[in-house]
Amino acid sequence: MELEYESKRPLYIPYAGPILLEFPLLNKGSAFTEEERNHFNLQGLLPDAVETIEEQAERAYRQYQDFKNDSDKHIYLRNIQDTNETLFYRLLDSHLSEMMPIIYTPTVGEACEHFSDIYRRARGLFISYPNRDRIDDMLQNATKQNVKVIVVTDGERILGLGDQGIGGMGIPIGKLSLYTACGGISPAYTLPVVLDVGTNNPQRLNDPLYMGWRHPRISGDEYHAFVEEFIQAVKRRWPNVLLQFEDFAQNNATPLLNRYRDEICCFNDDIQGTAAVTLGSLIAASRAAGSQLRDQTVTFLGAGSAGCGIAEQIIAQMKSEGLSEDEARARVFMVDRFGLLTDKLPNLLDFQSKLVQKSENLTAWQTQSDAISLLDVVRNAKPTILIGVSGQPGLFTEELIREMHKHCPRPIVMPLSNPTSRVEARPEDIINWTEGAALVATGSPFAPVHYKEQQIPIAQCNNSYIFPGIGLGVLASGATRVTDAMLMAASRALAECSPLATDGHGALLPDIDDIQGVSKCIAMEVGKAAQLQGMAVVTSEEALSKAIEHNFWRPQYRSYKRTSF
């Protein structure tokens, strides 16, 4: 096989001695052979034994198990990543379902809050506003030259934790770890970036150890000019890169996506990735119930950019199943802190305005006040699907869920807020309140629920089912943009991988340990959609499949040969 040949072919490198051991992408530690130790001036710098990567991974896993709390485990794994990336990904490869909650949600949230306290070693780029005239130089300073995927944040809306300043860097680092572990994208091609535009978090500003720019956040024209400078510099340095916007605040997320999605190959995972994985889950859940999404009525708690992004994808799918635009929009109800979005509410954001319900259609509703509450919507609209993206814990109350179950024998309830401390309701409660009838998917990981004689698996509606496959599909196909059709293709591919939808039993979403296969399936459909839309060169399916395999990196050591600079 071509990949086997690639892994056996030697890599020619100019580094030697302690410098080589300090290079995470190239360091093998105790796995350097005797020949390599001689050629690269490593004799005496390592213990005598020459180990395999399997032996190294076994030792690392034993050390990992010695840590009792998740935060310490996260720090330990990050240390391995900053020391020997190949070993880090071999360890993840062997224990992905166990370690994913440690390297990403929910543990990464705590790591972001304490970023300056637990900081060990530089990774990625920190681009601060005071240095805005030197962005080109900063990109040249990146240790990776052939960058193909960037995840960038400004740290303002980190999970459900709000403004963390440069602490938000934990999210791009974690996200790119999953691009590699789940989607096979070589870590040599990835770059995490934080745009340090200050912070409005008084805890960070008053923390003597805070490592970011100690200044209130810039906003308005200054902010957008800074982002523009960054984007143009990226285009000059890596014109074909895939750029993922991550954890930008609501007032910036959608405008930035709309501004740049037709200029560069980019997407916003909070808006589009969340929408894609949720839509894929809902298509699968509808199939499992013997229906289509067009037959469902959907209520959202949370009408921010993420919730509205999901709603628009649901509407697009309903239209593809035969509903008109008006019919589809009439089936989607958006509730925020001021109640149901209607055409009488003032000061709606642009992306919210298309998702309002017409007041004339609500005249027969029985409500408690002029502001139509979530409970009012459940009583009157009688939804079959309830989705939480509010970031506020406990808002899916027992009264609410029982009311929903009165008119819906098999309610689909998705409390998607992250981290776990922000979830709208716990799966165990939802299942108990519906006498075991509810189909539950969450944003953070939860253990299976024991109900009577059943063990009910809880699907984690995690973006990691989607974005690694999108990234792999973009790289393999050479796509120049990420379009709505490509995202829709990703959702449908995920639905095809659902055990519950295909077999009639099991979990709603595939096991996390099967996610590499899922990513390849998604990559194929994303690549085909890119070709159909003229965003990639048209090839045969066989050629696209080979390109996906060729781009799928595996954590194996290659032999090294020495060369000069």
Curated annotation (Swiss-Prot):
NAD(+) binds at residues 157, 270, 418. One of its GO terms (biological process) is malate metabolic process. The keyword Chloroplast does not apply. Its cofactor is Mg(2+); Mn(2+). It holds the Pfam family Malic_M. Belongs to the malic enzymes family. This is NAD-dependent malic enzyme. The lineage of its organism: Bacteria, Pseudomonadati, Pseudomonadota, Gammaproteobacteria, Enterobacterales.
